[in-house]
Amino acid sequence: MKQIQTKVDWKKIAFEGIEGKRITKEDALAILEADDTEVLEIMNAAYMIRHHYFGKKVKLNMIINTKSGLCPEDCGYCSQSIVSEAPIDKYAWLTQEKIVEGAHEAVRRKAGTYCIVASGRRPTDKEVNHVIGAVKEIKETTDLKICCCLGFLNEDQAKRLAEAGVHRYNHNLNTHANHYDNICSTHTYDDRVDTVEKVKQAGISPCSGAIFGMGETKEERVEIAFELQRLDADSIPCNFLVSVKGTPFEGRKELTPVECLKILAMMRFVNPSKEIRISGGRELNLRSVQPLGLFAANSIFVGDYLTTVGQESTADWEMIQDLGFEIEECAL
């Protein structure tokens, strides 16, 4: 006799999450393994959690790539790595004036957070000073929250960034520890965890997430979500692999839009009160179902990414408005 599979009550699990009961790894995995016909029910339950903590608000973030390419690390997914042959722009540090101009552009795009990103393994003290100079001017002229993503930091660098007014520091775990050697050999998973811990100790809000679609298993996707829970990351970017031509990961099979939705929902269930951001690869992987992603996530990037093109900000504003959601804005 064929065994009848018991249907999961996603709303019940969502209610329990709102009341403080943490989802189990088994139920988190069940989200990823659910039949595609259940995805709307899953997203509806995820929205219950999202709405409880964030209402109808959507946070917008904008990136500036202040130093592009020329990175000594061999991350297989990255077009800026030493092993990449991707035809990208390569340049040293932008001037402080250019970084400040980018902040004003972020405000015009209705972003509330401005992320200053630089390629490379780790910044020198001189480079940290360069960023600090720009941060101070931005803080004087806008209400933007400043996020930095500069690579590995030592304790003194983290402390100085905090003192300068850096609100958040991004350092993604990227994938599960068991899978890390398959994507990079020049540093370790533990190196990344160490930097997240350092910025937390300095009083900076930790931003850390993952890139999905790099050959990891569904179980490993669940494990990375729980590791981010353990690290208490305040902001969790969910990136979906863009297999850039010229990188070792060129030609990797893309995730389906429904797979991406399940990942976003799972991340919301595991980290109910955290900012979940649909990040790199949003347009390519989610495609026509991008709006549905915001029923689990409460944050997106506007404008371009590091080396790939995003959609027009006006399209993002319209998407948010059409959903009946509202943008969290800051002002000059």
Swiss-Prot record:
Catalytic activities: (4R,5S)-dethiobiotin + (sulfur carrier)-SH + 2 reduced [2Fe-2S]-[ferredoxin] + 2 S-adenosyl-L-methionine = (sulfur carrier)-H + biotin + 2 5'-deoxyadenosine + 2 L-methionine + 2 oxidized [2Fe-2S]-[ferredoxin]
Query: How is the cofactor bound, as the UniProt entry phrases it?
Result: Binds 1 [4Fe-4S] cluster. The cluster is coordinated with 3 cysteines and an exchangeable S-adenosyl-L-methionine. Binds 1 [2Fe-2S] cluster. The cluster is coordinated with 3 cysteines and 1 arginine.
Pathway in which the depicted protein is active: Cofactor biosynthesis; biotin biosynthesis; biotin from 7,8-diaminononanoate: step 2/2
Q: Does the entry feature the keyword Membrane, yes or no?
A: no
Q: Enumerate the CDD domains for this protein.
A: Radical_SAM (cd01335)
Q: Which InterPro entries match?
A: Aldolase_TIM, BATS_dom, Biotin_synth/BioAB, Biotin_synthase, Elp3/MiaA/NifB-like_rSAM, rSAM
Give the Enzyme Commission number: 2.8.1.6
Q: What are the binding positions for [4Fe-4S] cluster in this chain?
A: 71, 75, 78
This protein's cofactor list reads: [4Fe-4S] cluster; [2Fe-2S] cluster
One GO biological-process annotation of the entry reads: biotin biosynthetic process
Superkingdom of this entry's organism? Bacteria
* Recorded GO MF terms: 2 iron, 2 sulfur cluster binding; 4 iron, 4 sulfur cluster binding; biotin synthase activity; iron ion binding
Q: Reply yes or no: does the keyword Nucleotide-binding apply.
A: no
Which residues does [2Fe-2S] cluster bind?
Answer: 115, 147, 207, 277
Q: Give UniProt keywords alphabetically.
A: 2Fe-2S, 4Fe-4S, Biotin biosynthesis, Iron, Iron-sulfur, Metal-binding, S-adenosyl-L-methionine, Transferase
* Enzymatic class: transferase
**UniProt record similarity statement:** Belongs to the radical SAM superfamily. Biotin synthase family.
State what this protein does. Catalyzes the conversion of dethiobiotin (DTB) to biotin by the insertion of a sulfur atom into dethiobiotin via a radical-based mechanism.
Write down the HAMAP family for this protein, in alphabetical order: BioB
Q: How does it assemble?
A: Homodimer.
Please state what the protein is called. Answer: Biotin synthase
Source organism per UniProt: Bacillus cytotoxicus (strain DSM 22905 / CIP 110041 / 391-98 / NVH 391-98)
